[in-house]
């Protein structure tokens, strides 16, 4: 289910990359991304925000306990595909134009937020994470599936070299961002992480190191200094 949003366009356009990304999704799922996507979303409930929803590949995998999904996507071609995907989903989905650095949600309005292959490409990662923390209620979860800086020196060096040209070719994507450190620096508590390479090949491409994880906006102190989870 979906509703359209009359907000003015953000003007974020990557027409060539958007079409390549949309066509690559099913192939990536066949290679194993589908398993990671399902793990990313398992157990979510309540009101959820997905930033950089792309063409809506995640929509079919949200559990029925999700009562509303606010799907934010700035690229017009991908957003149109997401609206179509939302119409076929089993949960209520509101697809909107918007960017990670100014999320269209009130403070503490979400039970969870999802970032799937998006923190690599936001212009200001710290600001995007601050926005995600803002929209989460205390105790709310940030679910993330991202490609990140390698934990081996050789591949990390290759990533830094690749990033000279990679963002221009791949919709602003960076291969060498230390996203886990950025998440903790934004005030989140890391709950769980799993690092892996995808695709897992003998000669790994720069964007192959990935992390799948859960972080939490810390709960607010209770009346007597104890922590309360709403």
PLM regions with names:
Residues 49-102:
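Class I SAM-dependent methyltransferase SAM/SAH-binding core
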Residues 111-124:
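A short SAM/SAH-binding and catalytic strip from SAM-dependent methyltransferases
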Residues 126-141:
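A short glycine-rich, Lys/Arg-flanked "PGG" loop and its adjoining helix->strand segment in the class I
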Residues 194-230:
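Core SAM-dependent methyltransferase catalytic element
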Residues 143-165, 170:
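Conserved class I S-adenosyl-L-methionine
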Residues 172-187:
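Short alpha-helix
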Residues 24-47, 57-61:
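Conserved alpha-helix/loop element of class I SAM-dependent methyltransferases that forms part
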Residues 101-113:
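A short acidic, Gly/Pro-enriched loop at the edge of an enzyme's catalytic core
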């Amino acid at each position: 289910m979906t509703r359209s949003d009359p907000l003015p366009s953000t003007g974020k356009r990557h027409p060539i990359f958007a079409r390549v990304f949309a066509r690559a999704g099913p192939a990536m799922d066949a290679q194993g991304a589908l398993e990671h996507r399902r793990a990313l979303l398992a157990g979510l409930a309540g009101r959820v925000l997905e930033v950089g929803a792309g063409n809506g590949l995640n929509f079919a995998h949200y559990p029925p306990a999700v009562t509303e999904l606010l799907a934010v996507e700035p690229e017009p071609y991908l957003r149109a595909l997401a609206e179509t995907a939302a119409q076929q989903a089993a949960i209520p989905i509101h697809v909107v134009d918007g960017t990670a650095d100014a999320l269209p949600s009130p403070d503490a309005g979400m039970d969870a937020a999802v970032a799937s292959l998006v923190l690599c490409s936001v212009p200001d990662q710290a600001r995007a994470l601050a926005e995600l923390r803002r929209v989460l209620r205390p105790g709310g979860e940030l679910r993330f599936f991202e490609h990140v800086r390698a934990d081996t020196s050789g591949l990390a060096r290759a990533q830094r070299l690749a990033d000279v040209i990679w963002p221009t070719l791949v919709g602003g994507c960076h291969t060498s961002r230390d996203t886990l450190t950025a998440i903790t620096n934004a005030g989140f508590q890391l709950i769980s992480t799993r690092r892996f390479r995808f695709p897992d090949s003998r000669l790994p491409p720069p964007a192959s190191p990935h992390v799948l994880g859960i972080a939490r906006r810390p709960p607010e102190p209770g009346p007597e200094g104890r922590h309360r989870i709403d």
